[in-house]
Amino acid sequence: MNGARELLLVLMAWGAAQGASAQNAATVNPELVRVRYIVNDVPASVAFYTTNLGFKLDMQSGPYFAALSRGGVQLLISPAKGPGGASQPMPNGERPAPGGWNRIVVYTPDLQGEVDRLRKAGVRFRNEVVVGLGGNEILVDDPSGNVVELFQPTYGATPK
């Protein structure tokens, strides 16, 4: 019963943050791209994305959920364990876990400057800068081991 109560509180907070009245429901943009990352610690992940990568906190429901945005993408952060649907096991028993190789890509006009700034902030890197055909990239881990790619296009322009 405690898990159901916690889930209800999360949903109520989410609804309140979204202005879940019939009038305001029409303002939610169904075209907005949303990405969900499973994390070990929602507050630590919120701090990482807002402090280091320029995301804006849209809403947070304690340690159970947060929505952040940057440009036209909304990042949904859910814990690996908790009352929310994203943390529930699959029918085969497999549980959601952070990490892996799927990733969001953050464009930057100055990759080396970002690398220097993030190294000083103690961010963990998976590799060194890779020079590719379309640009240069490097991979960093968020506090839960989810990958974020920092990318500078070959021509130095950030897509609009």
Language-model features: locations:
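Bacterial N-terminal signal peptides that target proteins for export
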Residues: 1-8
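Vicinal oxygen chelate
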Residues: 21-33, 56-109, 115-141, 152-160
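Conserved active-site tyrosine of GNAT-family acetyltransferases
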Residues: 45, 49-50, 118, 145
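Short, contiguous alpha-helical
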Residues: 142-148
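C-terminal segment of classical bacterial N-terminal signal peptides
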Residues: 14-21
